[in-house]
Design a protein with these regions (language model features):
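Gly-rich Lys/Arg/Thr-decorated short loops/hinges at beta-loop-alpha junctions or inter-strand turns
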Residues: 11-13, 52, 92-102, 120, ...
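N-terminal amphipathic, basic-rich helices that act as targeting or association modules
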Residues: 1-88
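Glycine-rich, acidic/polar active-site loops that bind/position phosphate-bearing ligands
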Residues: 63-72, 104-116, 184-186, 190-194
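A short glycine/serine-rich beta->alpha loop
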Residues: 18-21, 57-59, 102, 144-156
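Mobile "lid/hinge" segments at catalytic clefts and subdomain interfaces of large enzymes
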Residues: 5, 62, 145-194
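Short, glycine-/Ser/Thr-/acidic-enriched flexible segments
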Residues: 37, 58-60, 91-93, 133-135, ...
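Anion-binding (especially nucleotide phosphate/pyrophosphate-binding) glycine-rich loop
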Residues: 79-151
Length: 194
């Protein structure tokens, strides 16, 4: 997948530069190289135009993944359209120490974890079991890469930006659309220079 992203990057950026008539920021390069359908015939106005994007990856945490996966199951698909992972970390309360807390969560949320694992296995979704790590750190260490675009059902999804990935937290419905091979609609973001 990473090779595919980099293979289309130069052409997408070149096309976007010609359309906009200006140099692009790193964020704009990522946005223009992840357009649904591959390219555009016009520049997009920041903060005004709604644009369809094709993210490279999705990450879901266990609390929000439940409804997202139930909705995906209704889509009639046999497999997710883009690499997707479920991370079991939010239903584990930190109270008494890792061993005790994990045992408690596995008991209290066993049905949820079993459901998530079963659905993940059925639809080709990566499953990170309870105790495997916190979603935003696992994503950073295993899936983030410069120039990529991902969405995640966790407010810390943006952590993947530390490696140059455009990573945005979304609701479960947005994640389901991308899992089901539909575009992800977003108002072309305003950019702040730092």
């Amino acid at each position: 997948m990473i090779k595919q992203v980099y293979a289309r990057l130069d052409k997408s950026v070149s096309n976007a530069r010609q359309l906009t008539g200006k140099p692009l920021t790193a964020s704009e390069k990522i946005l223009y190289s992840h357009l649904w359908g591959g390219k555009t015939d016009r520049p997009y106005e920041r903060g005004n135009d709604y644009v369809d994007f094709a993210p490279d990856r999705i990450a879901c945490q266990d609390a929000t993944a439940q409804m997202a996966l139930l909705q995906f199951m209704q889509a009639g698909k046999t497999k997710v359209a883009v690499p997707t992972t479920v991370h079991c970390d939010h239903l584990i309360q930190a109270k008494s120490g890792a061993t005790v807390d994990l045992k408690s969560a596995n008991s209290t949320s066993a049905e949820v974890f079993d459901f998530l694992e079963s659905v993940s296995n059925k639809y080709g979704i990566g499953f990170w079991k309870p105790g495997a790590g916190i979603i935003h750190q696992v994503v950073l260490e295993n899936y983030a890469f410069p120039g990529g675009m991902m969405i995640g059902t966790d407010s810390h999804t943006v952590n993947a930006g530390g490696l140059g990935m455009l990573a945005i937290g979304v609701g479960g419905a947005d994640a389901v659309d991308v899992m089901a091979d539909m575009p992800w609609e977003l108002k072309f973001p305003k950019l702040i220079g730092v």
